[in-house]
UniProtKB/Swiss-Prot annotation:
This is Large ribosomal subunit protein bL19. GO terms for molecular function: structural constituent of ribosome. GO terms for biological process: translation. Gene3D superfamilies: 2.30.30.790. NCBIfam families: rplS_bact. It comes from the Bacteria. The keyword Ribosomal protein applies.
Length: 121
């Protein structure tokens, strides 16, 4: 029974999305339907946490806009997600970056990985 559930979850998981880690800055494009029209909305932010696994995996992004910190969570295997693009790789020593919540400006920055180490990650 356990193998059957795992097989079903593996079928539902998307493989076309970019590989990213906590601390990376990513750009997520999602389909938004307003009225009778559909458009693509892009949200760019720092990955604070990845939760779950398989078909129910989620990612939480943090972004500072106009001096206010904002968070948004995405279900990675959602059909609403068009694409995920890695903008830059970050260097962090934590699995969850919830300490970014109260920070703005330079305090909310994550060190960037540059060169060959960023390509390996």
């Amino acid at each position: 029974m356990g193998n059957l559930i795992k097989e079903l979850q593996d079928e539902q998981c998307r493989t076309d999305l970019a590989d990213f880690c906590v601390g990376d800055t990513i750009r997520v494009a999602t389909n938004i339907s307003e009225g009778g029209k559909e458009r693509v909305q892009v949200f760019q932010g720092t990955v604070m946490a990845r939760k779950g696994g398989g078909a129910g995996e989620t990612v939480s992004l943090h972004r500072v806009a106009y001096g206010e910190g904002m968070e948004k969570s995405f279900l990675l295997n959602s059909p609403k997600i068009v694409s995920i693009e890695v903008v830059k790789r970050g260097k962090v020593s934590r699995a969850r970056l919830f300490y970014l919540r109260g920070k703005t400006g330079k305090a909310a920055k994550v060190k960037e990985l540059i060169g060959s180490r960023a390509a390996k990650k």
